[in-house]
């Protein structure tokens, strides 16, 4: 038996032996849906790190750059559809094997695939919120507002980048118009957790509560370089839970894994979860 078949057989056994699986997914779970990931096989950034919270809140130029890239990128990101990995994980959940699926992604593709008990750890890009009055709204109308205010930008075409942005390096963002909150005139931000921003406590508590009842952990498409997800794997290892990962390249928790499959998530899960 070659190593590929051996890995798949081992993963089938791992999943078959679990009744209360804690699943953690990252950007690699959505690459087959056309959404790029952040890191290379060594866990290093493929491009500049995403904008951080302080920069976004601290100046109009940073917000203009962010919203210009997001507005152009949304046309691609908003049309992304679940791939075989999302559908396979949804099937596991529908069979009652998944206690909670925690995703670091903001694309809502697990829900689109019919997933149950999904926790959006880092929020969701299909909603926006005001940082002053907490007004919230869907991305569709906000996207329309952005495009009306910036018709010359709306015509641009660019390659997709992670988290719904577009590659617009070299552009002059100084004339991009960033609309204000329709209620109070405050700063509007996507309802996602930026770098430098804290994950809401209730989400972290819900994840830890599910982990306490889990009998195994499956990591899908994450290098675990971000502490926000890595901490749950750390806690699982301390509790003696078996941990498996499907990921191309190294993860921060390689020494904690009982099993690792270094192949594309969609291919692997389509084969082991019929």
UniProtKB/Swiss-Prot annotation:
Keyword Cytoplasm annotated: yes
Domain Deacetylase sirtuin-type residues, every copy: 1-274
Gene Ontology molecular functions: histone deacetylase activity, NAD-dependent; NAD+ binding; zinc ion binding
Cofactor(s) recorded in Swiss-Prot or TrEMBL: Zn(2+)
Parts forming coiled coils: none
Positions bound to Zn(2+): 130, 133, 181, 184
HAMAP family per UniProt: Sirtuin_ClassII
Protein name (database record): NAD-dependent protein deacetylase
Native source species: Bordetella pertussis (strain Tohama I / ATCC BAA-589 / NCTC 13251)
Taxonomic lineage: Bacteria, Pseudomonadati, Pseudomonadota, Betaproteobacteria, Burkholderiales
Gene it is expressed from: cobB
